[in-house]
Regions:
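N-terminal, charge-rich interaction modules
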Residues: 1-20
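Short catalytic helix/loop segments, enriched in acidic residues and glycine
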Residues: 21-39
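A generic structural motif
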Residues: 42-48
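Short beta->alpha junction loops
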Residues: 49-58, 110-113
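Structural motif
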Residues: 57-64, 117-118
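Mid-chain, well-packed structural core segment of small domains
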Residues: 61-99
Length: 131
C-alpha cells in the first residue's frame, strides 16, 4: 500500500505574523486543514503519518527518526517549513534528512495543508515514472 508522510512545523511554533506565510492562518486553521489532508489521503487509499517538527536543531533528527520507522513512498513537506526566508536553514536540514533517510521516496511540497493530497499525487506520479 502507498504510504505518505506529511511533514510540517508544529502549528504552535509557527510565527503567523510572518508575511511570507498565507494571510489569516493560525494554529487552529492549520490543524483543521491537516485533518482534511489526512482524510483525503485515506480517501485516495493511501496510508499516512503526520510528523511535526520544531524550528530548531532537533528538526533533522526528528525527521530521520520518523523516516527510519517506516518506508514512505512520498514525503510532503509543508509550506510553513519552506516559505519563510528566515527558515531556509531549517528547510535545508529537512531536505537533507529526507534525502539521507528515505532516498527512494519522492519529495513533494504543498502550498497549504489542505492541498497536501494533491502534492502527494504529484510526487507519486514522479515516482511511478522513475521506478
Amino acid at each position: 500500500m502507498t504510504r505518505i508522510l506529511l511533514l510540517g512545523l508544529d502549528p504552535e511554533t509557527v510565527d503567523f505574523s510572518d508575511p511570507a506565510l498565507p494571510p489569516g492562518m493560525n494554529a487552529e486553521k492549520v490543524r483543521a486543514a491537516i485533518a482534511v489532508a489526512l482524510k483525503q489521503f485515506t480517501e485516495r487509499g493511501w496510508e499516512s503519518d503526520l510528523c511535526f517538527i520544531r524550528p530548531d536543531e532537533t528538526a533533522g533528527t526528528t525527521v530521520e527518526r520518523q523516516l527510519a520507522s517506516t518506508a514512505y513512498d512520498c514525503v510532503v513537506i509543508g509550506a510553513g517549513v519552506r516559505l519563510p526566508p528566515r527558515g531556509l536553514p531549517l528547510f535545508e536540514a529537512v531536505i537533507n534528512a529526507v534525502r539521507k533517510a528515505a532516498p527512494d521516496a519522492t519529495i513533494a511540497f504543498n502550498t497549504r495543508p489542505d492541498d497536501s493530497a494533491d502534492a502527494a499525487a504529484r510526487g507519486l506520479a514522479l515516482r511511478s515514472r522513475t521506478v
